[in-house]
Amino acid sequence: MPELAEIEVIRLALEPLVVGRSLRVEEIGPHDMRARGEGRGTGRTKAWIDAAGLLDGARVSRLERRGKRLAMVAADGRVLVVQLGMSGQLMLAPDAAATHRHVTWRVSRQRHPLVFRDPRRFGGVTPYASPETLREAWDADLGVDALSVTGPQLAAVLRGTRFVKALLLDQRAIAGVGNIYADESLFLAGIDPRTRCAKVGRSRAHELADAIRTVLRRAVRTGGSTLRDHRTALGKPGQAQQLHAVYGRSGEPCVRCGALLRSATLAGRTTTWCPGCQRRSGAVQEG
């Protein structure tokens, strides 16, 4: 599933290609894929999104991102948010697959179309009436962006008895971290994912915030993690998966200490960690 790093890779690549240029909706796919209400509360009500809502005829003034959500903001105030879900792709490339296309735009002065596709159909698009409406919705639904999270911000939400891994996956607490980068960040910070939030002290919260930013920036620099579907906006696979220290490596030796990596299901997700490098403060005791 695309996480913050993959969405940021797409934003950075698309920015010079679409900002300042006009969009024309060339093709609209299944309406249920595009059925997302506007803002919090109405987001549960499916509604048809017409070409105007898809920024037909609009000039893109900027691209914004918070967490895993990407917004195209038009000069006339219209906003369209794209969520890639599990397998979504947003690319301006000649090799964008013809199947599972949900919206295709023609971009002025660009040879290739901009395509949003999602084979597994967990993604979608959401129109907003204005940038102010967008920010209100994001402030209501999303926590601080993980790429800029600070130690004090993270310490403020590290409360209660749930596992720190579960907290990192909560988009209302910190936006953008998913299963891959939660595992990688906890490893870099040396924190056992089973540690209770209340047991993570202020100094360790600062270390974890630093680790989150470091892991995400490294992933962005290397094009994001391509495990299956992720492609950059130019249709290329990322290389960040080659840097994974723990994610997907259960039973293999730790790259740092050589201990065999362990895994368990936490917060409904497979979680991998090193028993030698990641401290167990407040963690569940083994039975």
Q: Which residues are covered by each model-predicted region?
A:
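Basic, nucleic-acid-binding surfaces and adjacent catalytic neighborhoods in DNA/RNA-processing proteins
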Residues: 22-50, 64, 157-287
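Catalytic cores of large soluble enzymes that bind and process phosphate-bearing ligands
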Residues: 2, 6, 146, 204
